[in-house]
Amino acid sequence: MSQTAIEGEYYFRKMEIASGFNFSKDGKFQFFYVYGSVDRNAAGSFTVEGDTLKLKSDKEPGKDFTITNQSKNGSGYTVQFIHPNKYVLKHILCTFVADGKEQQEFTDEDGQVHVDIPHCDTIYALHTLYPDIPTIVKDDKNNNNHFTLELKPSLEQVSFKDIIFKIIDGKTIECINNYFMDATDIKFIKQ
């Protein structure tokens, strides 16, 4: 199947959700998603392999936050997020991995999470309003235990990393696996 077979606009609509793609002849796409107070977007390129549609967003996956400060101070592990809009600070999930075991904690109203654990190999951060590939805050080579991070403007974009789309026919594209939309049975229909 050639790329031109999916050229045009495809939409998914469900109660409170509107989403769509615009695929162009030159292998580029634009995407939007609106759900309640959350708006997301993406742009990039696409390829078609058989009945599989592969998207490559301009957004780099796993880079939703920037570490602005890190240090070794006291005990436990503290991650502080900063952003002018306090509403977005309380929806960040941090995953602390120690010896293969995970502990997940949400940030408080001020964008902070603290865990009293003696050792942590890896820390990941994921914004639950804008889910995408988690950002690595700390790896096993980093001995720091206090981190300050800023939310990047690209947070609202979708990377589409590891997302599989199947071309059902000339008018339907189905999202097989999904981490970025609060919906199931996602089928984009050509308009």
Region spans (language model):
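Lipid interaction determinants
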Residues: M1-Q191
